[in-house]
Amino acid sequence: MLSPPLEDTRLVAPPAPLERSGRFDFIDAAKAIGIVLVVLGHAPGAPNGVVTLIYSLHMPLFFFLSGYLLSPSRAQAPLRATLLRTGRALLVPYVFFFAVSLVYWLATRDLGARAAKFAGLDTADALHGFVTGLSAELFINPVLWFFPGLFVCQLLYAVVRRVFDARTALAALAVFALALLAFTPPWTLRWPWGLDIAWIAVVFFAAGHWWRVSAWSPRLSGPAEWLAALVVIAAWLALAGTQGRVDLAHANFGNVPLLFVPCAAAGIVLVLGAAQSLPASSALRWLSDNSLVIFPLHPLLINAASGAAKSLGAGPYGPLAWVLLSAWALVACVPIAWLLRRFVPEVLGAPRLALTPRGAA
């Protein structure tokens, strides 16, 4: 996930399935599923129903995993230390990938349909988006909003933890977020760096961290496990269908905003269940370790490939193009990630963001 490396990667009294072979294979799998969902959700040609389901959970999942990755000691660290560590881990990549996106935009903004899309916009407008950190104004690469958004979320959680323990913090934040969703009008005036949606996102962050420190894990097997899975799947599908297309980045919480949190929670539970059932693999590990590279670069890679295809006369995109473009974005990140980690690891916020257990080196 897009988060600082752990200070102590040992889980606190973990259930046995969560850690295998010296790595958190459970986390690797969940991060891998999450980043693949992000790419699939942004590639053209995706069926509308699939996009609706992906958007119902993919960004809340990332906030949840970021909270899970926060070690208990760092949750209690002084605010200054949290500010410096989180700034290095998130804002340095934000600056770097914004610069990469700006160069790509300047090189391609006058090509094809992009000429009309970006008519009247210049570098000053792009820099304005960088300052606000809002997806709608980061037109050169809208996904970059997540970097400042997670930065604010982590700082907000750090402040709350000065007052409450993990369980009480989760309860207080959940009540406040649900009250906001239930009793406030639709978001019209956006605040920079996701300061408005941070109150919603931090609930998932707090839930992830509470799950880690509590070591809670339901013990189901056989028919009970399958029945629980079917109930959660049915609830998720029903809630997502009721909600329609949501988008946390744009403060769009669906047709019934109060259902945004439970719908995302059901989706997260399904991903976690799937993650625990997957065997460890080098592919999942690679996707997990390089999610920080895939996340900001996949829109540029997809745009480059789709633009090239259109210049060759490719027609409207369907499911096959959707799959191929998604696969291209993931495969193209293999050499890019290697180059970045080999030569300029500093731009990723740390020499290595993989979950390496203490003493393994």
Range-by-range predicted roles:
Residues 56, 81, 89-90, 142, ...:
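Residue-level signature of transmembrane alpha-helical entry/exit and packing/kink sites
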Residues 169-180, 225-234, 291:
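Central hydrophobic cores of alpha-helical transmembrane segments
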Residues 54-55, 62-63, 69-71, 101, ...:
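Hydrophobic alpha-helical segments with transmembrane-like composition
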Residues 11-12, 219-285, 300, 316-318:
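Alpha-helical transmembrane segments and terminal signal-anchor/GPI-anchor hydrophobic tails
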Residues 2-13, 278-288, 301-361:
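C-terminal "closing" transmembrane helix and its immediate cytosolic amphipathic cap
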Residues 19-25, 43-53, 82, 191, ...:
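Juxtamembrane loop-transmembrane helix junctions in multi-pass integral membrane proteins
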Residues 75-85, 158-169, 212-224, 276-286:
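Membrane-interface helix-boundary motifs at transmembrane edges
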Residues 21-48, 58-61, 65, 88-109, ...:
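Kinked, hydrophobic transmembrane alpha-helices enriched for aromatic residues
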